[in-house]
């Protein structure tokens, strides 16, 4: 974890198929990275904290955690507003069950099979960007108990924490 990766822009497939890999990367500066596709795909033992990563420049997270069967870490604070490709992102990530309701997925055009086979994912995604998204959602929750809500989060909705000061009804109308 002492590597200086601050100038790296492409981390696609970096730990793909590294089945025993489970090292701490929490202090990595990934703020310049634009591609994280397949980064942890089939890294079946990986389950470390990435919550403080600055992923605001990333555009491609396709298959990022696909088949990362142990991964179940909080990613709720990630700024994914630049992401356009999220297809298969958590496909067959069989332990993943974190709340992503407040992700800004408004730029995403591909959510195809995003949670396909993510058998532990029991969340109802109810943030404004999820509800209003026009992305390709083919097979998004195939073989997964998760779903996208037909209405926007309120404080009483299980799994959806309303952010303080935000008025989701106004956001829907704007």
Language model features with spans:
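Negatively charged
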Residues: 1-174
């Amino acid at each position: 974890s002492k590597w200086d990766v601050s100038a790296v822009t492409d981390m696609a497939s970096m730990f793909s198929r590294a089945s025993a890999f489970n090292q701490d990367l929490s202090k990595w500066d990934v703020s310049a990275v634009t591609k994280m596709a397949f980064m942890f795909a089939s890294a079946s033992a990986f389950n470390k904290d990435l919550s403080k990563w600055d992923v605001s420049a990333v555009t491609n997270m396709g298959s990022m955690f696909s088949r990362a069967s142990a991964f179940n870490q909080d990613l709720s604070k990630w700024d994914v507003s630049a992401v356009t490709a999220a297809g298969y992102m958590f496909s067959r990530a069989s332990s993943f069950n974190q709340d992503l309701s407040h992700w800004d997925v408004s730029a995403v055009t591909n959510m195809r099979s995003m949670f396909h086979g993510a058998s532990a994912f029991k969340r109802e995604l109810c943030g404004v960007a999820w509800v209003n998204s026009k992305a390709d959602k083919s097979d998004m929750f195939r073989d997964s108990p998760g779903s996208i809500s037909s209405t926007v989060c309120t404080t009483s909705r299980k799994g959806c924490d309303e952010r303080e000061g935000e008025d989701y009804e106004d956001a829907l109308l704007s």
